[in-house]
């Protein structure tokens, strides 16, 4: 008698397993589609079903679970692609900024080579002021006659050139 009950229970469990496989096929779900984490969750779900003596899986929940996991995977891929694009944009900006810095450093070095020290500039200014003052002093000492006409000098030069 005990043997018969056990055999009936085994047959019942085999029919239940076949029923679940058929329901998974109806949902177009293969167990190979799931990751290890998903399979662990399904194992846990099966344990709860056996503990609670639930013998019918609602396919809608299983489909929702599968779709949610698939959507999550697609969103993660999309996020990864967006982050790669953003990283490329940032890297190209960094590269462009680096080129600009190198160009500005070359310009700065060239400008520093051409730079005249302040002491030299002050000496040149002092020398120019001294020369200007000397020329002004010479001009003051130069006596120009009052009847001097520049036009008559120009005419004489022109006549000499013509001869």
Swiss-Prot record:
Tissues with expression: In adult females, detected only in the abdomen with no expression in the head or thorax (at protein level).
Keyword Cell cycle: yes
Coiled coil location: 86-115
Gene deletion effect: Mutants are viable but have greatly reduced levels of augmin complex subunit Dgt2. Mitotic progression is delayed but is not blocked before anaphase onset and chromosomes are properly segregated. 7% of meiotic chromosomes in spermatids are missegregated. Mutant males are fertile but mutant females are sterile, developing fully mature ovaries but laying eggs that fail to hatch. Chromosome positioning and segregation are disrupted in oocytes. Chromosome spreading in oocytes following nuclear envelope breakdown is not limited as in wild-type and instead is spread along the spindle axis.
GO biological process: cell division; female meiotic nuclear division; mitotic spindle assembly; mitotic spindle-templated microtubule nucleation; spindle assembly; spindle assembly involved in female meiosis
An example molecular function term from Gene Ontology annotations: microtubule binding
Subcellular location, record wording: Cytoplasm, Cytoskeleton, Spindle; Cytoplasm, Cytoskeleton, Spindle pole
Keyword Cell division found: yes
GO cellular component labels: cytoplasm; HAUS complex; meiotic spindle; microtubule; protein-containing complex; spindle; spindle pole
Superkingdom of origin: Eukaryota
Keywords: Cell cycle, Cell division, Coiled coil, Cytoplasm, Cytoskeleton, Meiosis, Microtubule, Mitosis
Job description of the protein: As part of the augmin complex, plays a role in centrosome-independent generation of spindle microtubules. The complex is required for mitotic spindle assembly through its involvement in localizing gamma-tubulin to spindle microtubules. wac is dispensable for somatic mitosis and for assembly of spindle microtubules in oocytes during female meiosis but is required during female meiosis for chromosome alignment and segregation. It is required for microtubule assembly near spindle poles in oocytes.
Quaternary structure (record): Component of the augmin complex composed of dgt2, dgt3, dgt4, dgt5, dgt6, msd1, msd5 and wac. The complex interacts directly or indirectly with microtubules and is required for centrosome-independent generation of spindle microtubules. wac interacts directly (via coiled coil) with dgt2.
Name the record gives this protein: Augmin complex subunit wac
């Amino acid at each position: 008698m005990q043997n018969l009950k056990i055999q009936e229970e085994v047959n019942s469990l085999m029919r239940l397993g076949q029923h679940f496989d058929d329901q998974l096929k109806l949902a177009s779900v293969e167990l190979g589609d799931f990751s290890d984490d998903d399979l662990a969750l399904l194992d846990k779900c099966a344990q709860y079903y056996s503990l609670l003596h639930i013998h019918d899986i609602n396919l809608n929940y299983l489909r929702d679970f599968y779709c949610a996991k698939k959507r999550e995977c697609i969103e993660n891929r999309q996020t990864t692609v967006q982050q790669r694009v953003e990283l490329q944009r940032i890297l190209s900006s960094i590269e462009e900024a680096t080129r600009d810095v190198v160009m500005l450093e070359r310009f700065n070095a060239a400008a520093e080579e051409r730079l005249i020290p302040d002491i030299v500039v002050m000496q040149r200014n002092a020398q120019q002021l001294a020369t200007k003052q000397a020329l002004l002093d010479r001009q003051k000492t130069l006596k120009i006659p009052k009847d001097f006409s520049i036009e008559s000098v120009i005419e004489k030069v022109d006549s000499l050139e013509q001869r």
